Amino acid sequence: DGVGPHNTAASGRKAYTALSTKNDTQALAVAARGNPDMANLTTVPELLLLGGGLPLRAKGEVVGAIGVAGGGGALPDRACALAALAAVPELDSPTL
């Protein structure tokens, strides 16, 4: 697949961020740029506010998360995560 080991760490942090905040990491990144209180989240070492992390929901409940890294940037990583969610019919469609 050609990605470096740092992408494994980044994908894990994106998944952790999506799970712990119950939010799309791309949305968090955008919010952090415009809100000083949200920007404080960037100082939490475990969190990574870059696109590619999505919470997984089934019947409205968060049941896990996915994190994607190494796809060429935050938006391609997010697109890959969305495609993965779409392939699992038991999961709710994410709200965009």
Residue ranges and their predicted role:
Residues 1-96:
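Flexible, solvent-exposed loop/hinge segments and secondary-structure transition points
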